């Protein structure tokens, strides 16, 4: 029997444009449970069985204590669904112990570069990988002129850097970068609701010719 831990750090979620954009509470965990069932089905033939134990850490909670709890109960493999800074702290807290962490959520590029850790493996693609994949597809489709709507949050700017890098690598052309200063919900006027779709013609007015609008 191989016990596998799943440590999920809850983070404060922004307001969503639509209820359809709200993440399900078991996001990530549900995927691990499906994988567990699949592996245990074939595991009957290879005499391998896996169990999954989930530790959810509330916003501002002690993720290191939850990881230590899993380690003390014999979990040598722990899936970590947490922001990059939390992942690095967890890696340092468990250094030298027989525990291997799997990054299943953080997309930060530095985790595979200057902040690479020997006790962390990655299943989540980083932003550069995601941008490279998008760029290769767009160039293959001959959609090489890109209009970029950029946000103002650190995550937005990090993805924007990845898009710029991918454009240079694969031959895309960013015809314009335009900052989108919007709220995170549909209320944009004092008089009531205004659909985001209706804002796009105004937002893109006067832009150079482009094949694709990329949201960063």
Residues of each region from the PLM?
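Short beta-strand elements in bilobed, periplasmic/extracellular small-molecule ligand-binding domains
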Residues: 41-59, 116-120, 167-193, 212
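Soluble non-cytosolic domains of exported or imported proteins
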Residues: 19-30, 57, 61-64, 81-88, ...
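Signal peptide-proximal N-terminal region
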Residues: 15, 22-54, 171
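Extracytoplasmic ligand/sensor domains, especially the bilobed periplasmic-binding protein
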Residues: 75-179, 183-184
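Short, well-structured alpha-helical segments in soluble
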Residues: 57-76, 137, 190-209
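A generic secondary-structure signal
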Residues: 38-42, 69, 136-140, 165-166, ...
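Short beta-strand segments enriched in small/hydrophobic residues
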Residues: 1-28, 36-38, 146-149
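Structural motif
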Residues: 79, 212-216
């Amino acid at each position: 029997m191989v016990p596998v831990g799943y440590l999920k750090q809850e983070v404060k979620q922004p307001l969503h444009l639509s209820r359809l954009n709200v993440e399900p509470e078991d996001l990530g965990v549900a995927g691990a449970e499906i994988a567990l069932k699949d592996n245990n089905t074939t595991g009957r033939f290879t005499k391998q069985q896996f169990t999954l134990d989930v530790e959810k850490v509330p916003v501002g909670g002690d993720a290191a204590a939850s990881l230590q709890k899993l380690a003390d109960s014999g979990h040598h493999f722990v899936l970590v669904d947490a922001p990059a800074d939390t992942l690095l702290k967890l890696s340092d807290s468990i250094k030298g112990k027989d525990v291997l962490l799997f990054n299943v959520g953080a997309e930060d590029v530095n985790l595979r570069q200057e902040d690479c850790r020997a006790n962390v493996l990655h299943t989540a693609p980083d932003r550069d990988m995601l941008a490279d994949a998008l760029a290769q597809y767009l160039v293959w489709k001959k959609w090489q002129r890109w209009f970029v709507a950029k946000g103002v949050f650190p995550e937005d700017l990090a993805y924007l850097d990845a898009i710029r890098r991918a454009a240079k690598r694969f031959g895309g052309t960013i015809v314009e970068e335009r900052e989108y200063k919007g709220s995170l919900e549909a209320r944009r006027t004092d008089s009531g609701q205004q659909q985001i779709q209706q804002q796009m013609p105004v937002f893109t007015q006067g832009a150079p010719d482009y094949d694709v609008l990329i949201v960063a």
